């Protein structure tokens, strides 16, 4: 069964743009408004980060957003409860460290997720070899566990991950944490092009994407981008009009490969 998330991100003439927000940054009551705004801006899907006290993959902008959400006492369960009444039509993706999921309980977590528009899960601190902690619970559902692939992964590992991939492949474009970047590794284009050539699902580039030029760069070698820190910062600063224009322009970038 092809997952809804794969269908949404595949076979497009234009780059798929996935945005990231921190759930509860600005208060949980604003979450639905943020989601509807991003949907209206033309994005293909939205990642919702779950605040956590030890966010090892997060850069400074997202770390601060997580702290703001934690001060509001936002939890994974509270976010999923809120999402159960969401009117958003595009797929949502939960990005959570494994600890909050364990705390809630994996069966309860999956049960709650299925009552929401969530169609994908990203767990950055769950090693690929341990994915079976989650995947048995996802059998028969429309929810994909999204693999993250690093720049340093050898071809054999890329092929192994691609063969098992569902939803899409999250290609991490830098060695390090999230955050705005001005430059990327000179080998990134070759890496992404190879990954796309072997992947049965869309390949999206994430970590550091913050400009239309970045979107255009990655649209030449993969299926789209994930934009996080820039979105989080602009929402926090109240720059919604500027953000909406940026995302609309990003979603109009044509795929060149």
Curated annotation (Swiss-Prot):
Protein name: Tryptophan synthase alpha chain
Coiled coil: none
Family: Belongs to the TrpA family.
Entry function: The alpha subunit is responsible for the aldol cleavage of indoleglycerol phosphate to indole and glyceraldehyde 3-phosphate.
Biological or metabolic pathway of the protein: Amino-acid biosynthesis; L-tryptophan biosynthesis; L-tryptophan from chorismate: step 5/5
Enzyme Commission number: 4.2.1.20
Residues at the catalytic site: 47 (proton acceptor), 58 (proton acceptor)
